[in-house]
């Protein structure tokens, strides 16, 4: 649901009948007004018993969305980035990016991969320091601080953006090196890539069908699920430029919400829904 000045709501229903769970999430981005103390992204999740419609929980949708979105992006980065990557450009250094890059580096180290990784960070209100602090104990993570998007993206093997509001492309085509992977978590700022990248991967075709250049890149688009199931190839060489619109779908929210709810060791709040057929 689009609003003025780039604000919006996303309404995301989902049902998993085998688990007897249904969910509706509403999450939106709204510019912060003067004097407000909140995140620009806020959301809530309603969790239901799917066979009765009884509400089981009202949950913080922002926290769950941040976790699953960042982890989905990190998974995409591991899946589609060229194996010999060295340099990662990061734009939008907020909560989602924090989850994403922590998960990305942690997954490398968990597999015994101690390679040197250079993170190129855009300078913005000191946010770069938060990312640098995450890896102060890892001597193989290095940093380059950049003042322009051209510096961040140019020469990077992997580019991840988590900016939630942008009105134009970050850079022109020549800054995307051969073999790079681009993951625009919030889908913004890389519309020019739709026109010349070699491969596009997505978690849900319907989510991107309304994109301006969908008809142009649809023939080279593959569902990530098909790659994971072995039904389609992922990256096939080190020269393909790959664009990934894989940032999580409602079923991921449901899985996170159901698992958190199942582990909640707190008393239930009474829910006084009507138990009478006639209540008027």
For every predicted segment, state its role.
Residues 73, 84-107, 122-127:
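Glycine-rich adenosine-cofactor-binding loop
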Residues 107-135:
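NAD(P)-binding Rossmann-fold cofactor-contacting core
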Residues 1-66, 74, 84, 222, ...:
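N-terminal ligand-binding/catalytic initiation module
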Residues 80-87, 177-178:
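Short helix-loop-beta connector
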Residues 141-215:
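Rossmann-like adenosine-cofactor binding region
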Residues 193-280:
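Adenosine-phosphate binding glycine-rich loop
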């Amino acid at each position: 649901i689009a609003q003025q000045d780039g604000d919006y709501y996303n309404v995301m229903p989902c049902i998993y009948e085998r688990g007897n769970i249904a969910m509706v999430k509403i999450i939106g981005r709204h510019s912060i007004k003067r004097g407000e103390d909140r995140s620009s992204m806020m959301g809530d999740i309603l969790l239901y018993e799917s066979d009765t419609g009884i509400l089981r929980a009202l949950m913080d949708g922002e926290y769950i969305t941040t976790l699953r979105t960042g982890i989905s992006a990190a998974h995409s980065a591991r899946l589609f980035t060229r194996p010999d990557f060295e340099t990662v450009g990061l734009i939008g250094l907020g909560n989602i990016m924090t989850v994403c890059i922590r998960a990305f580096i942690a997954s490398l180290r968990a597999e015994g991969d101690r390679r040197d990784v250079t993170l190129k960070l855009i300078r913005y209100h000191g946010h770069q320091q938060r990312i640098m602090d995450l890896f102060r104990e890892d001597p193989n993570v290095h940093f380059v601080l950049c003042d322009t998007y051209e510096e961040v993206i140019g020469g990077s093997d992997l580019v991840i953006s988590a900016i939630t509001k942008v009105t134009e492309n970050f850079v022109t085509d020549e800054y995307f090196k051969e073999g790079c992977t681009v993951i625009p978590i919030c889908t913004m700022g890389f519309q020019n890539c739709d026109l010349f990248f070699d491969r596009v991967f997505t978690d849900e075709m319907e989510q991107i069908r309304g994109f301006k250049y969908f008809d142009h890149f649809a023939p080279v688009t593959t569902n990530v699920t098909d790659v994971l199931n072995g039904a389609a190839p992922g990256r096939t060489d080190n020269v393909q430029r790959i664009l990934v619109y894989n940032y999580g779908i409602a079923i991921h929210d449901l899985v996170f919400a159901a698992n958190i709810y199942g582990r909640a060791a707190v008393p239930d709040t009474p829910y006084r829904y009507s138990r009478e057929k006639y209540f008027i």
